[in-house]
């Protein structure tokens, strides 16, 4: 099932989210240290990624402006964004950098350990060269 909104192509974006989009791997074992985790569930993550999905779910025409790797995790993120109705025409792909990953544990109510795997990752490569002329501020 595709949640894409039937927006008119000429309609301007309500929101363009720029920044981190990554893959979050949450440990399936709650209340267990990460070193004891046996399995993980994969989700779209990153502040900008989460906001683009949330606003799309609320009915806004949202776009994601970031970079992902051409690796399988980058393909996963692009597919998830599209599934959620987020416009990915501004989402760039780079073959030279891996998509960022985060491994997270869940120990409610106040402990949520996480490990970032973001060394020189794709979304950190975003720069002015990725902005096309129609997207640039006037």
Label for each model-derived stretch:
Residues 2-86, 110, 114, 121:
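Glycine-rich phosphate/adenosyl-contacting loop at the front of the ribokinase-like
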Residues 68-69, 89-97:
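Beta-strand->loop->alpha-helix junctions that form or flank phosphate-binding loops
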Residues 96, 108-110:
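Short strand-connecting beta-turns/loops that link adjacent beta-strands
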Residues 101-105:
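Short beta-strand scaffold segments in enzyme catalytic cores
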Residues 117-120, 132:
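Divalent-metal (Mg2+/Mn2+/Ca2+)-assisted nucleotide/phosphate chemistry catalytic cores
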Residues 123-128:
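Glycine-rich, highly charged phosphate/nucleotide-binding loops
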Residues 129-138:
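Single conserved hydrophobic/aromatic residue that forms the stacking wall/gate
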């Amino acid at each position: 099932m595709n949640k894409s909104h039937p927006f008119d192509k000429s309609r301007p974006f309500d929101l363009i989210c720029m920044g981190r989009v990554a893959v979050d791997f949450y440990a399936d074992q709650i209340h267990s240290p990460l070193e004891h985790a046996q399995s993980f569930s994969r989700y779209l993550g990153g502040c900008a990624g989460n906001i683009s999905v949330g606003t799309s779910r609320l009915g806004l025409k949202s776009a994601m402006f970031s970079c992902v790797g051409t690796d399988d995790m980058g393909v996963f993120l692009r597919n998830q964004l599209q599934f959620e109705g987020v416009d990915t025409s501004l989402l760039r792909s780079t073959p030279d950098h891996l998509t960022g990953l985060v491994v997270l544990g869940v120990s409610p109510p106040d402990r949520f350990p996480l490990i970032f795997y973001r060394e020189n990752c794709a979304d950190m490569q975003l720069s002015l060269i990725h902005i096309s002329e129609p997207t640039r501020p006037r």
